């Protein structure tokens, strides 16, 4: 065999564990057809975090409007994009150097499985004892007329100028996070959602808070709508619509155009304009249409049919050892269908576990409680047992902690910050929902508490850095412990 293990994909699902296998003496090949590092490093989390940061700061500054803030806080998107491109471009180069440092072989091109022990990359064929699929997910593009006009998350995170009026199809992570950026940039957008709720895996009262904030900033929501087609129009003038049919073709006076009476943005002529038609008759116009309808397994053309391995949009079904139905083929990261949230942190956990598994040192994989965050402005986070389960079960109590109203957090004027903490009958914390500007940090704190089974009494014996959102939240847990 040429290699002990071939990884198809170079993201966190592969190299995080591959380096340990190489250190143990195994010969490793990583196959990559695009940039080293995968989606998160190059066209996902990292890009989004950098582009979002100035708007987060702007929102915090706006909290002091009329009580300390002077002047306007403006974000220069083109300059921000230059910074993003510079930073992200360095990521693939950084990993290329790291792969050399770890003594990992790399083949650049699409990896195709020919049989259970052979992978082809271009004209080269490599034999291997085991194969690990780490191909990740790709954006879902609906099979509808005009889908060639759709942009996915990769496009938006590399756009030179923000659209004047975007239409976002989807109300999940991507759709809501992009809507927040557009709202803070003072632009308009329509969000089309197929079901009756956005961010269905997050605490709905907090989601509704976000929706109301976005509505106040010219983001409109259309629920229970299915997009039928997308049409590219001639040069037109687009109003700011909230109507069933918007028709502003040449010859129509702008005064005749139905428009949102609360709109704060004037009509503008767009060089490119698109009409999005829905089954209900809803018709919207904009200059940029984003497909934010989720992601699906990126396995087309990988050759799974050559080994009789099937998959779904959720990926390859694996057992508790991340092993597929073909014994020597494994899956790690987003492409593994495990029922666990598809997050980069989970991919890292799986990759490190798989290194132990392939060395014969592991039992079935065990997942800690996984925190999840949607980076809207403000953030929403969830970890452990959801509040709605706690509210419906006699096994739990749900305590609402409005820590933003504590005097320490008022220094940041984040007055709406709060958490709903789920405790069991023994007063052990088993879950939390957080709504705050710094929700991700508080979620990580709760994840640590839950995973390490730290009791309320033990928390009460600790001393924390103050003032901080976590310290105030923890102090208020004292009231649960002593039933104040």
Predicted features by range, described:
Residues 439-452:
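A short, polar/charged loop-to-alpha-helix boundary motif
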Residues 45, 135-188, 220, 305-307, ...:
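Glycine-rich dinucleotide-binding loop and its adjacent helix/turn
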Residues 71, 106, 112-120, 185-320:
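A Rossmann-like FAD-binding core segment of flavoenzymes
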Residues 9-12, 33-34, 171-172:
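Glycine-rich Rossmann-fold phosphate-binding loop(s) that bind the pyrophosphate
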Residues 1-5, 10-16, 23, 216, ...:
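Mid-to-C-terminal Rossmann-like scaffold of FAD/NAD(P)H-dependent oxidoreductases
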